[in-house]
Amino acid sequence: MTLKSNKNEPALILDSVTSVRTALSDLYLEQLLQNKPTDKQAAMQTYENKGAEVFSNGSAGHINGAELSRMREVAFEKNQSEPLGVTLKLNDKQRCSVARILHGGMIHRQGSLHEGDEIAEINGKSVANQTVDQLQKILKETNGVVTMKIIPRPQSRSKPCEMYMRGQFDYDPAMDDLIPCKEAGLKFQTGDIIQIINKQDPNWWQGRVENNAANFAGLIPSPELQEWRAASKSKAREGSQSCSPFGKKKKCKDKYLAKHSSIFDQLDVISYEEVVRLPAFKRKTLVLIGAPGVGRRHIKNVLLTKYPEKFSYPVPHTTRPQRKGDANGEEYFFISNEAMTKCISANELLEYGSFQGYMFGTITETIQKIHEQDKIALLDVEPQTMKVLRTADFGPLMVFIAPTDTAAQTENLQMIQKESETILNTYRQYFDVVLVNNDVNESVKIVEEALEHATTTPQWVPVSWVY
């Protein structure tokens, strides 16, 4: 706006300024009334946003015996049905401080507290000389508006953490005596995909279960802590007699794996497996695992007969002499002892064993040739072999076949059931599908549907399959 000068210029300017001031005042008042916060919103505001910082006027203030140059007061409304998402600790000066903020929790969403902040008062009462359990109880039992006087810790920007892990064990924080706060723990089961939000604490990470209704994170033991715990239990059992987890003798004795045992000793200490989500892709190998007598070979034969253009079984190699009527490459490839020994030394066998003085084994090259024909290699192997197969080269779908759960339990069925439980408890983390073989045709249908689902929907796979 341009004002032209004339003799009444001072009066005109004064009138214009007054009009503008009135208009702005009315507009401000209207906006203020429209945006007036509700009582709940007002209670949720923190004094930090209003700049309510208390400074000493030259002489240091004291609270909890500490000299302060600055203190801040924050307030928020505590919802009784939702945890605050904060844990406390005593710092090196034995003062109450914020140990961690759980991602997605009430405090995290408000941003009113930060890790390392010292808490001097809660609702006007000093927290000096209180234990951590007493402090947590005070917060848990406080309802409505909560006010705190805090000494803020200088904040540094930390790089955000976002990774995904598959839980390889069942975890219930209520049963964990090591967790600093059971209420802050995250319960999960073997196979759950966990989004890791924060791993600054070397012992307790923050995560949340993927596709879970709860939006806030919880505490889980870090891989280091869980592996230490598992190793401690294993060490305690060292004095006990070591034997095969599958005590019953089998037709094929002295079974071996085509890798060094030390590798598997490392793999036996389980905690989490880092995973990545991939678009749908074709599985190259179907692996059937189960106790002897459970019916996995019957299921395998039905699949091979029903879909010869889709599945193929790798023909094993043997040192047994070729008999009359034996066609090389039909049921077996017949090779010499020297050739078999070379294959074993070169780690070319997936697994091998001896029977009646002859060696039998599956060479990995036969599996690769099936893949080259654009077919799915169908395997029924020992449970230990899954560790070798679980790579991008084999791209497997692992299926565990459990025995029938019918009421009529014969002695033989009870033995199969017991051995199946041992396999499942030991290798549960490797199975993509678990089915109960009450009916062969129904079991075949479940396998077909599982394979179709795995090849048509996005899948979580070990990160080693990609990088």
Curated annotation (Swiss-Prot):
Residues 283-452 form the Guanylate kinase-like domain. Its main location: membrane. InterPro entries: GK/Ca_channel_bsu, Guanylate_kin-like_dom, Guanylate_kinase_CS, MAGUK, MPP1_SH3, P-loop_NTPase, PDZ, PDZ_sf. It is a peripheral membrane protein. It comes from the Eukaryota. The keyword Nucleotide-binding does not apply. Pfam families: Guanylate_kin (PF00625), PDZ (PF00595), SH3_1 (PF00018). Keywords: Lipoprotein, Membrane, Palmitate, SH3 domain. Residues 73-154 form the PDZ domain. Extensively palmitoylated. It is found in: Membrane. Residues 160-230 form the SH3 domain. GO terms for cellular component: membrane. Belongs to the MAGUK family. May play a role in the regulation of neutrophil polarization. This is 55 kDa erythrocyte membrane protein.
